[in-house]
């Protein structure tokens, strides 16, 4: 599942412990790479990327099963294995530990796990942003965000659900001091909200769609109110990408071939969507409903325009501040700019001597120019 923090049974200290362990493990990996990598890296032939089930990432599975990924990899003389994992955070952990060359993840998680752990990472493709896929729910009719004041709110702490809640509170002049968060895993959120004791929750689709369809429930805020702030991306190890540009070309080419197919109206397009729906555990109507709140960039130009927007550094600065305020950039982080980020046109945010997250549109630009 997308954007799920570890299940910790309402014990936030364990969340922090897990993130600290990930931080030190990633730092160790980064250090080992620094001391053992030769000056002249030899081009590789075999690569692995991973993904987990989420509406906007189903194309990666389709790329594998239909041979589209293999076709593009063969074009550039390499092999790319696209591996589905069952646990979202575990997929990022494995990428951070060097077991995968790339991984599908959100912008906030890219910053707070691999990048803050010292693994230089590149957002190869910003594939979509949440446009209603994440929401804040309150039991009762006609409720508003202000009704959360003094109330417990169930959510996956330190995830983008937490970020969404903070933005919702901010929109009405409130802050997290006005509520109490109750850490609840994504697997438990639906069951918890069904009990009389739980009145408020923040979650994402498909759980969100199921819960807000229940009687006497109000969605008081959703991610369409903060367009572009919750991004879904394919993140690749920067050193690996630098040494093996064929990987970037193959992944990008395969992705946008599928985007073109999904956006069409032909029988082949419907068959592709039906296949993705089945793989995600729903039917075609259900999958299309999830896609309706996912702002997918169906063309390379759309993705390029978003990735090169002057708003990108502003959005990530806000995300970094939230991450720092919640201790997600590591214990020794002095400020929200501890982890440097690079954007198009040589724009940087944060520590320029510690650039660990890069929004590099090079390969999407090649796709937009028809050069892949």
Role assignments for model-derived ranges:
Residues 319-372:
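Conserved C-terminal helix/tail region of periplasmic/extracytoplasmic solute-binding proteins
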Residues 35-41:
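Sec/Tat signal peptide C-region and signal peptidase I cleavage site
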Residues 242-333:
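Secondary-structure end/capping motifs
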Residues 188-284:
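Pocket-lining segment of extracytoplasmic ligand-binding domains
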Residues 16-25:
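Bacterial N-terminal signal peptides that target proteins for export
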Residues 1-17:
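Short, Lys/Arg-enriched N-terminal segments with co-localized hydrophobic residues
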